[in-house]
Amino acid sequence: RQIMSEADCLYNEAQIEAAIDKVAYAINAELSERNPVVFCVMNGGLIFTGKLLPKLNFPLELSYLHATRYRNETSGGDLFWKAKPEISFIDRDVLIIDDILDEGHTLGAIIDFCRHAGASNVYTAVLIDKDHQRKARPDLQADFIGLPCVDRFIFGYGMDYKGYWRNAPGIFAVKGL
């Protein structure tokens, strides 16, 4: 509780919902005729995916995958696959939905996995794009971005602090991080 009471609110729920509407509009314009397979990146992408899907007005197949570098810590390690996709996406367009593009190691590995497994095109949607110069690859950027964010440790709307506060109704920055 102390983490939340001392945190700075960067985006409130209304701002986040407006950003999700903006992302949905862009995805509808780009993918409505492409019959995509949509992958929710667990656990962080769960809330964003759940809020976004009802706003997508076209048929799609939904599945999930779980790859992480954090394992409830505040800094990342090696990529660990907890669950690889179980649905076929060979010769299909894929949309990967995740909570945040930070350095991009996890998202980059998921993109590579989908491309090597036969996806026609791979698109990415993130709720948050963290603003810094430490991206894993210079060309790595999300196709659909909800909100930019300062380079601080954040939580809420799916993002956690040591496994907690994914349920926070906004995006908050940890004091001192």
What is each of the regions a protein language model found here?
Residues R1-L177:
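PRPP-associated nucleotide enzymes
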